[in-house]
């Protein structure tokens, strides 16, 4: 499982180093094979170990194809998905088109989301993180099922 927010840097070629604490799990789960695609809701990228992405593809394939919203989601997620591999230094290259989508430049945040990572521009992450915190602190903003969650 992947958790935590990690400040990382992209080099001039668009490569980033996967934090070392995640590398062993990624290599053991999927031989360092990753899938990177857009997040269809937030202006960031989703980074999946290959085995986790294959579960997502199975679910996407099972969606009724006559529904336009299903086809739209399939086009966005699968059409933008790129197969990548960690190199010997634990780095991977984010293609220019995906860097443009997430407005990634030099400073980024790699945020563990249990089964995947989100890759954010650092400024965008800071803004959305602050907005999320402010929103959840509003009276009545927390759903009942989350109120029962013991933290």
From Swiss-Prot:
This is Transcriptional regulator MraZ. Pfam families: MraZ (PF02381). Residues 5-52, 81-124 form the SpoVT-AbrB domain. Its main location: cytoplasm. InterPro entries: MraZ, MraZ_C, MraZ_dom, MraZ_N, MraZ_sf, SpoVT-AbrB_dom, SpoVT-AbrB_sf. It is found in: Cytoplasm, Nucleoid. One of its GO terms (biological process) is negative regulation of DNA-templated transcription initiation. The keyword DNA-binding applies. Keywords: Cytoplasm, DNA-binding, Repeat, Transcription, Transcription regulation. HAMAP family: MraZ. Belongs to the MraZ family. It comes from the Bacteria. It comes from Pseudomonas fluorescens (strain ATCC BAA-477 / NRRL B-23932 / Pf-5). Forms oligomers. The gene is mraZ.
